Amino acid sequence: MGNLFGHKRWYEVRDKKDFKIKRKVKVKRNYDGNKYILNINENNNKEKIDNNKFIRKYINYKKNDNILKEFTRKFHAGNILFKLKGKEGIIRIENNDDFLETEEVVLYIEAYGKSEKLKALGITKKKIIDEAIRQGITKDDKKIEIKRQENEEEIEIDIRDEYTNKTLNDCSIILRIIENDELETKKSIYEIFKNINMSLYKIIEKIIENETEKVFENRYYEEHLREKLLKDDKIDVILTNFMEIREKIKSNLEILGFVKFYLNVGGDKKKSKNKKMLVEKILNINVDLTVEDIADFVIKELEFWNITKRIEKVKKVNNEFLEKRRNRTYIKSYVLLDKHEKFKIERENKKDKIVKFFVENIKNNSIKEKIEKILAEFKIDELIKKLEKELKKGNCDTEIFGIFKKHYKVNFDSKKFSKKSDEEKELYKIIYRYLKGRIEKILVNEQKVRLKKMEKIEIEKILNESILSEKILKRVKQYTLEHIMYLGKLRHNDIDMTTVNTDDFSRLHAKEELDLELITFFASTNMELNKIFSRENINNDENIDFFGGDREKNYVLDKKILNSKIKIIRDLDFIDNKNNITNNFIRKFTKIGTNERNRILHAISKERDLQGTQDDYNKVINIIQNLKISDEEVSKALNLDVVFKDKKNIITKINDIKISEENNNDIKYLPSFSKVLPEILNLYRNNPKNEPFDTIETEKIVLNALIYVNKELYKKLILEDDLEENESKNIFLQELKKTLGNIDEIDENIIENYYKNAQISASKGNNKAIKKYQKKVIECYIGYLRKNYEELFDFSDFKMNIQEIKKQIKDINDNKTYERITVKTSDKTIVINDDFEYIISIFALLNSNAVINKIRNRFFATSVWLNTSEYQNIIDILDEIMQLNTLRNECITENWNLNLEEFIQKMKEIEKDFDDFKIQTKKEIFNNYYEDIKNNILTEFKDDINGCDVLEKKLEKIVIFDDETKFEIDKKSNILQDEQRKLSNINKKDLKKKVDQYIKDKDQEIKSKILCRIIFNSDFLKKYKKEIDNLIEDMESENENKFQEIYYPKERKNELYIYKKNLFLNIGNPNFDKIYGLISNDIKMADAKFLFNIDGKNIRKNKISEIDAILKNLNDKLNGYSKEYKEKYIKKLKENDDFFAKNIQNKNYKSFEKDYNRVSEYKKIRDLVEFNYLNKIESYLIDINWKLAIQMARFERDMHYIVNGLRELGIIKLSGYNTGISRAYPKRNGSDGFYTTTAYYKFFDEESYKKFEKICYGFGIDLSENSEINKPENESIRNYISHFYIVRNPFADYSIAEQIDRVSNLLSYSTRYNNSTYASVFEVFKKDVNLDYDELKKKFKLIGNNDILERLMKPKKVSVLELESYNSDYIKNLIIELLTKIENTNDTL
């Protein structure tokens, strides 16, 4: 239940000797009895106390007005802000006379820089300064003699100057003699310190002591405290004092250190961030400081030190009996037992009876009449008048709750009420509690009025009787449904109702969230399989449900679709060489998939009856291993040889890092590489030695290589082995642990603990907690790279232009003996242990990285949530597959130098030869390519004429294969004696080695062609060329050839010269034309010439990095400051040219803004012509469908809970189960007994099902024949979303916005899902636009609301300057078009 004491962390307990001690504790509920546990943080001891004792202490804490006592205990005029000294014997400074005289504090000598030997002798600075004053030391003196003790010999101490470094064995110190002017300035500043401290202390003390005002008895005491502070004249005097200090600093910057010292924010002692921020503001003389800043400091500082709290108002009672009764009432009202604990205590509880009564009345539509009748008794009009009267008096705090309670006392205390049934009493209570919430709304609105966020409180609108009736009806329905679903959840998940507790529900909640995404993963894979297979003899695109009722129906490989996943399907033995579907697919794969899906939906926890064999698992493992791209292939694809030609030493250094899998545990708590990447790129971009490259393509080549190397380096540094021989080495993980722990000693669990604390903090509403943790890790990592791998980011020696790069790439590729520069990657062993890992691995092979990453992250989140390693193996498999997919897409670069026409022809030939994607064995390669291999062997041994004569005729008889992979050289068995003699000069081992090498070369060539076949396709290439040609040729005369330099430079016309990967990788998408249609016109209209004119080249080479650096530095400078402070700073930047020039190192804001706008225009055009938005749109479609599919899975799960809950209450009867069906509710199929055959649950009879259907309808769930979820395939919202039609065929007949509305409407039965559909979908866009979260909380529909999308989304603002992101307005309009586009068609989906 958390810490009831708010900021209070200390609690009084008894030690073993029964002495009262104070310990730092956390309070939590203990479920094995009616007790709370105090977790003592220091040593994890526990002490149990009973409820009443704990609650009594809590109530005393809330009632006890000890604020003044706490304030005076922790603060006095000597420490409230500046750390000042008091006279001897004065512990607390409360008056001006208590301060030590300024002359005794600010001395004309300063001492610092003590040597280590002097520290060891224990001679203090004070002793040295006192002796120096006594001896009259001047700046000309070089030594001073001091006795440690009276009877000891004098020690001679050298007086160094500040430019001389101390040594290990010297006995020295720096003594600085302060000049008179500086000394007087410091004394005057010290007097100001005293004035500020005394004024602050007296203001706060006065407010706390004020009995009349009683600030801390107000609900919003912070606001009242702020008002009181700002009204006090002394706060203006304090501000004036601060300005005096600033003026003195401005005239002499050496004074800054003196002020900092007395502000005392350094050191190891506890300091608030609030104080540190105020100190920064005080010392930053270029920024305005206001009285509001001072008031905010006081409020937050008192809160930080646990001084302020709201004091409970307690009516004074003279009668002892009444006082005891009142205290008992308090105790009862504060005992907040866990709701699951309540459920156990009252399991035979009357709530079941109440809920059954509500269900019957909801079903009969009589509940609304009952609510309206009770509401009429509550006399709302009278209450409104009483409340308005009280508000006119200025009372808008807990007093209005008193009016409310008094108004309804007659209803709840009367004998008439006590005679009502439990069901009626509960209905009264629900209404009462709802109205109490409306009173709370009045209080919230009053605060908004006071803060000028609202004009006035509209009580009549808040307490409108007709609106109240509708809202209370929803509340009653929700109350009823919650209990039904609560019971159903326990029953469905087979949880023991007598022992259930919060830990059970925490585990269950984690599992539920994983299950929802797994069901969505099944749906996504079903879509991918529908791209490969189609129904036999049916000429439409009707969906096949491979993991449901369709899995054994007739379907065939779709010959119309050329899909790279066919190779995977064939290697899994799901189709044979004639492309017929095998039993392995129907009887095994889909059966296992169906079983696993049903296990999830039916919450089956018993051990799996495994259907798959180790041979099945090995097929998947072999596919993953065969798809792996070697380090050499990666090097070739990413041109590491060219980019890191002069950096072999740094690559060797990276390869020499020894890794340990023991560090794997820390990986999951660290930021992903994508989070670190922007800062890594900044290391490259901000390196002053690096000059701009000649073309965008050159920079892309360098950056792609740099990103890959850094990705591998990041993994290696995390996994670096902490061996004994590495003790002297600066290992990153050790550095990070020291940084997080802020000490030299290493806490081995610090990373895990830091991460989990950030997660806990985020769950409590601190949205920045995780980002703050990630930032700290990233800063440490970037610092580590700067110290140890700076050379990696220095490309000052890289002088090649794009032509030279391509020539070198060709030369290296043509050189067969060239030893490539590679980054050695660890070769993980893939293991599949059961059917679940088998099915998920295949799903991952069939899906894109965008989908795999979602389910991978959910497995990871569940692992952390439940603190389990159960899913670690599947996470490793998914990571491996994503890595393969990423690297495979990079293999396009080697084809840059091919003529497009030639390349298309080449692909046609490859398609003929490698239509089945079959990987051949060594024996098959030798037999199939015998002539090629033989010719290579003859060339190798050409000097031996006699031997070559035999090899040409008899090589196939000399090479003897034992099996498909092993062979031997036999020069005797199958050839004549004379031939044996001729072969005598050819070494047997050499011949075997050469044959094996040429088989491997041929194998590599075959794999390369197959890989090329998988990635490229002649049809795709032709379409690619067509789209590029359309852009170049379809131009008006004034725009003619504006795309020439981007796509086909004149001197290399018709070549795949500048490869647009974004276009190519999307062109094979069945929906390419639809997606491209959204942006094609914008690309045509783009001013592409701007990218290559003088202005554009200057922007690319200079302005982009300059603007990015300015924005980053500004963000770093203002990081951690309050919003108000940032606004003041930015306002001054925009209005004051001198201030802007001084802080930003640019002319003025207007010139900066002009440069920013030009850079933005350049980036926008660049993104268009590079086809970047194709990926974004495709990603949007996947993400939207994924989010909506999760909502549909949520609905399906809830239906299971509702059926089980109604059965648990005895409202409906069931007669058994259909184990092969997943859905919870029946579907009409024309048969009389559909309610027993079409759902997982068999309803007892038709009457029982009709009752269930009517109850569901009462809650807002329509299961009728023509309802949303029971419509035909192309109309049912359930099928449309679950079958991923938004991705498969977007915009057809429906807009996406309409489908979002339909899903939201379907889930409207539960107020828990209020607007959750909209909120989850719009989260997809949050990286690209700013979302109005207040608008998202309101009720709305997307269809029929013309301006709702404009209100929900605003262009993204970047940096603290609040500049509009370069493409945010364009993306916002693109999103609106994406959501609202509709293509009316008569075709079926």
UniProtKB/Swiss-Prot annotation:
Effect the entry attributes to changing K471A: Severely impairs pre-crRNA processing
EC number: 3.1.-.-
Positions of region (NTD): 1-347
Effect of N598A: No cleavage of target RNA
Outcome (variant: R1312A): No cleavage of target RNA, no change in pre-crRNA processing
UniProt effect for mutating R438A: No pre-crRNA processing
Effect of Y334A: No cleavage of target RNA, no change in pre-crRNA processing
Cofactor(s) the protein requires to work: Mg(2+)
Biotechnology: Can be reprogrammed to target specific mRNAs in an E.coli system, which might be useful to create specific RNA-targeting tools.
Region Binds crRNA: start-end pairs: 330-342, 405-408, 432-436, 471-475, 502-509, 853-858, 1311-1316, 1338-1339
Superkingdom classification of source: Bacteria
Spans annotated as Helical-1: 348-498
Coiled coil: 893-920, 968-1046, 1101-1131
Record note on cofactor: ssRNA target cleavage requires Mg(2+), weak target cleavage is seen with Mn(2+) and Ca(2+).
GO molecular function terms attached to this record: endonuclease activity; RNA binding
Region (HEPN-like fold 2) residue spans: 1170-1290
Effect noted on mutating N1279A: No cleavage of target RNA
Outcome after substituting W865A: No cleavage of target RNA, decreased pre-crRNA processing
Extra facts: Part of a type VI-A uridine-preferring CRISPR-Cas system.
Name under which the protein is recorded: CRISPR-associated endoribonuclease Cas13a
